[in-house]
Curated annotation (Swiss-Prot):
Modifications after synthesis and translation: Activated by phosphorylation.
Protein name as annotated: Phosphoglucosamine mutase
Chain's gene name: glmM
Catalytic activity from the UniProt record: alpha-D-glucosamine 1-phosphate = D-glucosamine 6-phosphate
Domain of life: Bacteria
Pfam families registered for this protein in UniProt: PGM_PMM_I, PGM_PMM_II, PGM_PMM_III, PGM_PMM_IV
Length: 437
């Protein structure tokens, strides 16, 4: 059982337990000891996003790693999937990223990639947590470097997958995050006419009213400025959402459907949050559909288990396994545009080709996720909600892996909003009871 690592590394509010500089130093020592056991002269690539706390946590993590004799190569501000790509391409021992993805600036996190460019498996994270309990005297004097070719190498990798975008008017929402420099460069080099929004990070504005979790402003810009489409990234660039020319959200389920048809896939891996309409549409075309737990690491596991190459989440984490080991917002954007070129039409046409079932997702902030989820009354409430839908919808209640939140999802052709609201109130009441005990 992991205490610190969640579905996407270690997360929390920067400066508060567990994300204090003291803890991050110890985490670096434990990770350094782990990497030293894998390789005689370990090299770790280290990148960050644009949060004001990223420099502090980067320094603490680097110091811990170097105290174990690890060489640390600083990559600067770079999207998370860029670190995954470079870790594999440069044959580094590991990659590490200081980021909390789509979370607000007060939060931050640390995630590691192994030499294959995949996130460390659960067993490796458990071993690092075990090593956290031990003292780690200095085993060597690690060195540090600034790898100035990181952005260029990642850009070259992306451009190798880019279609000709000449004449396309694209609005980019960079979320004041890790894609703020490389995003506009990439689409301009591919030939697009680019309008960049939310591309002036100040350490505190990352994801604030913008990015893939808040695409409303981009939707407005696309319609008002007559753009062909909009593309919104999150703070660390591993997820993406699209806006069609009519201002509608073209999300991960639409992308999976479009890409599956364009690239001749045999099937798709979604998650328990994927819309039922995607499953039905794929099966009508003779394509398999599998559901994984939420989190791109679990999508990747299911892809390997099933032998498929395309998977993702409605939130915009999409894995094209033939091209990358993890979700990559920039790569997904390019391959989605390549799919459109192959099949014809634009995002608006393909939005209408997959009418999604109404889905309501409510986030309920709770005091103790584990207590709420273990309460047998929650299971009863879910069964009651399912009974109300009469077999014509789905209910899913799950804890967030990165926030103190329980997510309530109800999907149905009718009545989803009312059922979701009532179920969310039950979750809130259970949380208040648990807090009072």
């Amino acid at each position: 059982m992991r205490r610190y690592f969640g579905t996407d590394g270690v997360r929390g509010e920067a400066g508060k337990p567990p994300l204090t500089p003291e803890f991050v130093l110890k985490l670096g020592q434990a990770a350094g000891a782990y990497f030293l056991a894998q390789e005689k002269r370990p090299v770790v690539l280290l990148a960050k996003d644009t949060r004001e706390s990223s420099d502090l946590l980067e320094a603490a993590l680097a110091a811990g790693l170097m105290s174990q004799g690890v060489r640390v190569e600083h990559l600067g501000v770079l999207p998370t999937p860029g670190v995954a790509h470079l870790t594999k391409a440069l044959k580094a021992t590991a990659g590490a990223v200081i980021s909390a993805s789509h979370n607000p600036y007060q939060d931050n996190g640390i995630k590691f990639f192994g030499p294959t460019g995949e996130k460390l498996p659960d067993g490796a994270e458990e071993e690092i947590e075990r090593l956290l309990l031990e003292d780690h005297p200095t085993r060597g004097i690690g060195t540090v470097g600034d790898f100035r070719e990181a952005e260029r190498m990642y850009l070259d990798f992306l451009l190798a997958h880019a279609p000709d975008l000449t004449g396309l008017k694209v609005g980019l929402d960079l979320a004041h995050g890790a894609t703020y420099r490389i995003g506009p460069k990439l689409f301009q080099k591919a030939g697009a006419e680019v309008m960049a929004f939310f591309n002036t990070p100040d350490g505190r504005n990352i994801n604030r009213g913008c990015g893939s979790t808040h695409p409303e402003a981009l939707s407005r810009f696309v319609v008002e400025l007559g753009l062909d489409l909009g593309i919104a990234f999150d703070g660390d660039g591993d997820r993406v959402q699209f806006i069609d020319r009519k201002g509608r959200l073209f999300h991960g389920d639409h992308v999976l459907y479009l890409a599956a048809l364009a690239f001749g896939e045999k099937g798709v891996v979604g998650t328990v949050m994927s819309n039922m309409a995607l499953e039905v549409a794929l099966k009508e075309r003779g394509l398999a559909f599998h559901r994984a737990a939420v989190g791109d690491r679990y999508v990747l596991e299911k892809l390997k288990e099933t032998g498929l190459a395309l998977g993702g989440e409605p939130s915009g984490h999409v894995i094209f396994l033939r091209h990358h080991t993890t979700g990559d917002g920039l790569l997904t954007a390019l391959l989605t545009l390549k799919a459109l070129k192959a099949l014809g039409g634009d995002l608006a046409d393909w939005y209408e080709a997959l009418p999604l079932y109404p889905q309501v997702l409510l986030n309920v902030r709770v005091s103790d996720k584990a207590k709420v989820m273990a309460d047998p009354r929650l299971g009863e409430a879910v069964r009651e909600a399912e009974a109300r839908l009469g077999g014509r919808g789905r209910v899913n209640v799950r804890p967030s892996g990165t926030e103190p939140v329980v997510r309530v999802m109800v999907e149905a052709e009718e009545g989803a909003e009312e059922v979701a609201r009532e179920l969310a109130e039950r979750v809130r009441a259970l949380s208040q009871e648990a807090q009072a005990v």
